[in-house]
Amino acid sequence: ILIRISGYGQTGPCREKAGFGTPAAAFSGLTYLQGYPDRPPVSPPLALVDYMTGTYGALAAMMALYHLKTSDASEGQVADIALFESAFRMLEPLVAEYSLTGKVKERGGHIGQGAAPSGTFRCKDGKWVVMVTSTQRTFVRLAEVMGRMDLLEDPRFDTNPHRSENRQAIYDIVQEWFGSPD
């Protein structure tokens, strides 16, 4: 079993380039999505792409071992894993989104871009909390905790698609509830 890990794969125009996680994150498009819309893209603050690629390599080795042990195969396998492909793998849903809408996903800052409300909220003590309400049930629970059952009747917030259309408004309401530093 041979696991090959490189920056950009064994073939193609970039095969000779050095393989480092930060440039691979940028090459994949991952860096473009990090940060705020009105500011430059931000690289991941740790070796995220390196860790992901190592995980994919370990998984490939385990699958190749499993294949050897559970089949009549007598030869090993070769897996070619590129750093940028590991990062790009996380972005695959955006390819489908682009093909449907023709819109390039933009940086969202600290406000989550999936379910709403979601994102990073500043608390009264100056610390931060990350929260996501990915289902109607979790939004109902949030409304209960906030003492804001009226949000469930507001047509802007009664479903996740409606909350997503009014992302900033619901974010602001939740941020006010969390408080802000004095």
State where each predicted segment sits.
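Active-site-adjacent "lid/gating" segments in soluble enzymes
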Residues: 1-129, 133, 140
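Aromatic-enriched alpha-helical interface/lid elements that frame and gate functional surfaces
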Residues: 117-182
